[in-house]
Each structure stands twice: as C-alpha cells, then as structure tokens.
Amino acid sequence: MKKTAIALLAWFVSSASLAATPWQKITHPVPGAAQSIASFANGCIIGADTLPVQSDNYQVMRTDQRRYFGHPDLVMFIQRLSHQAQQRGLGTVLIGDMGMPAGGRFNGGHASHQTGLDVDIFLQLPKTRWSQAQLLRPQALDLVSRDGKHVVPSRWSSDIASLIKLAAQDNDVTRIFVNPAIKQQLCLDAGSDRDWLRKVRPWFQHRAHMHVRLRCPADSLECEDQPLPPPGDGCGAELQSWFEPPKPGTTKPEKKTPPPLPPSCQALLDEHVL
C-alpha cells in the first residue's frame, strides 16, 4: 500500500518537471466577460476567476502550481460545496487542480481541465486543517484495494460518500469521475435515493480524488458540452464491465497527437504569448 501511495503522490507532482506548454506562459486571467471556449479537452477560457486560497471551508493544495483558476461558476460551486460540507460536519474540503489562468493544455497529468469547468477534489475530509507543507506536497489517500475490485474498508467512510453525493446533486454538475471500485461502493450504499448516481462515472485511476465537471454556462456560446450520461444509476452491466479482464489482444491505445486548437483559443495564444 505504501508503494501505491508513493505512486499517487508522484502522479500529482510529476507535471511540474515536464516542459511547459504555451498556456503556462499566461500568468493571469485574460480580461473580459467569462467565456468557456470549445471542449473540456481542447479549449481555453477568457475572464477566469481566481479561487481564493483562504477559506474556512476548504484548503487549496499545490498553490505553487497556480492551477486555481476557473469559470466563476466553478469558483461558486467549490464555495457552495465546501460550505455544505462544513454545515454537515464532514470536514475540510481539499481542492486540487482546477485550470490555468487562460485554461488550455497542461504539460502533464490532465487531458481535460482546459475550459475552467473541471476541478479535482481529494476524497479526504480532515477534521484538522492541513499545514502549508502538507498542502504543497499532499499525501493522497488511496481508497481502492490493490486488485482494484473494491474500496479499502478502513479508509472508506460515509462522509466521503456524502461529499460525492452533495457534489452530484448540484445542478451545475454534469459528471463526477471516480474509480470503478468507488462507484461500486456508492451503488451498494445508496439505498433508494439513486438519481444522483447517474452523474458519477467510473474512470481509470481516480483512486484518491473525484474529478467534478460542470455544464457549459448558458452565455459561453462556444463551449461544447458532453452528451448527458446514459439514463439510470449506472450500477449494472456498464459498471461491471470495468472489473472484467481485458479481452485477448487488447493493447493500450497509442498516444494521440493533440488536435489543432479551436480558432478562438489560437487567437488568444497569438495575442498573449506568440
């Protein structure tokens, strides 16, 4: 388990050592009315807000990476969720990566988070606030067993389930990505109130955090939403398929060349970087 924790920590800090992308040269939000542009995995943002790093309800991790920017709707969602968590006595919400000042591609660790509508939130709820040293080098708590088939009972809690449920019930949220084993546990514990489970989607990794995605703001005319998740709670055959062994001959997909930037994002780079 210690090796897994080290690997998770390395995943969270590895991007700092990779070559910078042009988007990292933009150090402040681009002025203008907030506009999320294009798709979550190939886009940018004008008029991003800065998430305040000081709050009684949440703490921001790895502030040295300057990934605490997003659409005003995302900032308000984080403030709303963390306030609800505090009201219920769940603990302090730990905020990971949002986006860069103008969005755009990261140098590693994320394919999305480009339009200011994504945020990673640790699935830990400390009752005592973390020190600055802990926040700069966060220790991810792996909730999933080594074989990936279930959560670790001693690490799972109803508070974590409540945090995910609170996020899923927010009207601005369209998807929450978690490890399949975490989704499975949520399905087992949900009882008869299951509508919110539709938004919780199984995905690779995500063993220690949830990745929350908001819908496109109505006034962001170039923003591209994903189709809604399939109807139902997602606890049936689709979820079970994640636990089946890979079919013979299955290979890892080749790394794709990033697609061309949308014209509005290319124009933004041309004006502010190139």
UniProtKB/Swiss-Prot annotation:
Q: What EC number(s) has UniProt assigned to this enzyme?
A: 3.4.24.-
- State if Hydrolase is listed as a keyword: yes
Which Gene Ontology cellular-component terms appear in the entry? outer membrane-bounded periplasmic space
Compartments annotated for it: namely: Periplasm
Q: Which organism is it from?
A: Salmonella choleraesuis (strain SC-B67)
Disulfide bridges in this chain? 44-265, 187-235, 216-223
* Protein name (database record): Penicillin-insensitive murein endopeptidase
Residue span of the signal peptide, if any?
Answer: 1-19
Binding site residues for Zn(2+) 1: 110, 113, 120, 211
For this protein, the record's SUPFAM superfamilies field holds: Hedgehog/DD-peptidase
